[in-house]
């Protein structure tokens, strides 16, 4: 190949190493040198600018794969665990209740057995006492309460006043009643009381007296324990009614006799709730 000599630069041939030429063998073509020497005194032109980089190739965006669904096996295992825990607590509560019930039943059976043994023992002791004739131990005698409450006696027509000691609300215990008097059997402190109910169809304001006496062989005459007097107690010429009540504590001795006197027996109302006489030991 010829080239004109007046061309400032030699021609450059680019040969593809992969191509085959019918004119030359692959080994006879050599690559061009990287630079071509210039002539002396000639300015070398600047090298051509490098080619711009190819634009980046945008790959088509692909959608993200969907999240895998939650495992049904794990959910089932969790539910099964909760069910087992609940069943365990239910069984535990049932066992505790059963244990408490058994304990209460055992305790009740034990108490019942003890009661049966105690009753059997008492029955055996009683049977033995009856068989051998062993008397029971003497129990302490309860001291009788010294008390008396006498009520008015409608047919009383004498002084001292007579009283009812048996019927109605009357009672006598630990003392004696004899001919209108209460007889003391035991020395001590006693509360003595008496009430007399006076009434009349026509008032004349005559003085009324109500007295409680005690009589004892140690004294030459009877002693007045209590006394009540009434004067100007009603309106002249009209119906009237008044009560006289006496009560106090006395130290009485054995064999003392207590009785009641009034100044006007005919004006006394002998109803049991209105006229009475009594005492009790403190």
Curated annotation (Swiss-Prot):
Keywords: Apoptosis, Cell membrane, Cytokine, Cytoplasmic vesicle, Disulfide bond, Glycoprotein, Lysosome, Membrane, Nucleus, Repressor, Secreted, Signal-anchor, Transcription, Transcription regulation, Transmembrane, Transmembrane helix, Ubl conjugation. Gene3D superfamilies: 2.60.120.40. Glycans are attached at residues 185, 251, 261. Residues 146-282 form the THD domain. InterPro entries: FASL (IPR028326), TNF (IPR006053), TNF_CS (IPR021184), TNF_dom (IPR006052), Tumour_necrosis_fac-like_dom (IPR008983). The soluble form derives from the membrane form by proteolytic processing. The membrane-bound form undergoes two successive intramembrane proteolytic cleavages. The first one is processed by ADAM10 producing an N-terminal fragment, which lacks the receptor-binding extracellular domain. This ADAM10-processed FasL (FasL APL) remnant form is still membrane anchored and further processed by SPPL2A that liberates the FasL intracellular domain (FasL ICD). FasL shedding by ADAM10 is a prerequisite for subsequent intramembrane cleavage by SPPL2A in T-cells. Phosphorylated by FGR on tyrosine residues; this is required for ubiquitination and subsequent internalization. Residues 104-282 are extracellular. It is a single-pass type II membrane protein. The chain crosses the membrane at residues 83-103. Its main location: membrane. Induction: By IL-18. Residues 119-132 have a biased composition (Basic and acidic residues). One of its GO terms (cellular component) is lysosomal lumen. Residues 1-82 are cytoplasmic. Residues 43-71 have a biased composition (Pro residues). It comes from the Eukaryota. GO terms for molecular function: cytokine activity; tumor necrosis factor receptor binding. GO terms for biological process: extrinsic apoptotic signaling pathway via death domain receptors; immune response; negative regulation of transcription by RNA polymerase II; positive regulation of canonical NF-kappaB signal transduction; positive regulation of extrinsic apoptotic signaling pathway. It is found in: Cell membrane; Cytoplasmic vesicle lumen; Lysosome lumen. The record marks 82-83, 130-131 as: Cleavage. CDD domains: TNF. Disulfide bonds join 203-234. Belongs to the tumor necrosis factor family. Cytokine that binds to TNFRSF6/FAS, a receptor that transduces the apoptotic signal into cells. Involved in cytotoxic T-cell-mediated apoptosis, natural killer cell-mediated apoptosis and in T-cell development. Initiates fratricidal/suicidal activation-induced cell death (AICD) in antigen-activated T-cells contributing to the termination of immune responses. TNFRSF6/FAS-mediated apoptosis also has a role in the induction of peripheral tolerance. Binds to TNFRSF6B/DcR3, a decoy receptor that blocks apoptosis. Homotrimer. Interacts with ARHGAP9, BAIAP2L1, BTK, CACNB3, CACNB4, CRK, DLG2, DNMBP, DOCK4, EPS8L3, FGR, FYB1, FYN, HCK, ITK, ITSN2, KALRN, LYN, MACC1, MIA, MPP4, MYO15A, NCF1, NCK1, NCK2, NCKIPSD, OSTF1, PIK3R1, PSTPIP1, RIMBP3C, SAMSN1, SH3GL3, SH3PXD2B, SH3PXD2A, SH3RF2, SKAP2, SNX33, SNX9, SORBS3, SPTA1, SRC, SRGAP1, SRGAP2, SRGAP3, TEC, TJP3 and YES1. This is Tumor necrosis factor ligand superfamily member 6. It comes from Sus scrofa. The gene is FASLG.
């Amino acid at each position: 190949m010829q080239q004109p000599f007046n061309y400032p630069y030699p021609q450059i041939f680019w040969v593809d190493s992969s191509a085959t030429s019918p004119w030359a063998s692959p080994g006879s073509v050599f690559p061009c040198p990287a630079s071509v020497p210039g002539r002396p005194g000639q300015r070398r032109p600047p090298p051509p600018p490098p080619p711009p980089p190819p634009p980046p190739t945008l790959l088509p965006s692909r959608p993200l794969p969907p999240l895998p669904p939650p495992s049904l096996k794990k959910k089932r295992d969790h539910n099964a665990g909760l069910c087992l825990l609940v069943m365990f607590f239910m069984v535990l509560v049932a066992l505790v209740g059963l244990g408490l019930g058994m304990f209460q039943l055992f305790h009740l059976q034990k108490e019942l057995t003890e009661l049966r043994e105690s009753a059997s023992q008492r029955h055996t002791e009683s049977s033995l006492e009856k068989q051998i004739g062993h008397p029971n131990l003497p129990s302490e005698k309860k001291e009788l309460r010294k008390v008396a409450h006498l009520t008015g006696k409608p047919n009383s027509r004498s002084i001292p006043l007579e009283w009812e000691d048996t019927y109605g609300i009357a009672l006598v215990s630990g003392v004696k009643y004899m001919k209108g008097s209460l007889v003391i059997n035991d020395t001590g402190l006693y509360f003595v009381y008496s009430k007399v109910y006076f009434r009349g169809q026509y008032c004349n304001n005559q003085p009324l007296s109500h007295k409680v006496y005690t009589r004892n062989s140690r004294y030459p005459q009877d002693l007045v324990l209590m006394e009540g007097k009434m004067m100007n107690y009603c309106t002249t010429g009209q119906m009237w009614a008044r009560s006289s009540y006496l009560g106090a504590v006395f130290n009485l001795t054995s064999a003392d006799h207590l009785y009641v006197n009034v100044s006007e027996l005919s004006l006394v109302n002998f109803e049991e709730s209105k006229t009475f006489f009594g005492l009790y030991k403190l």
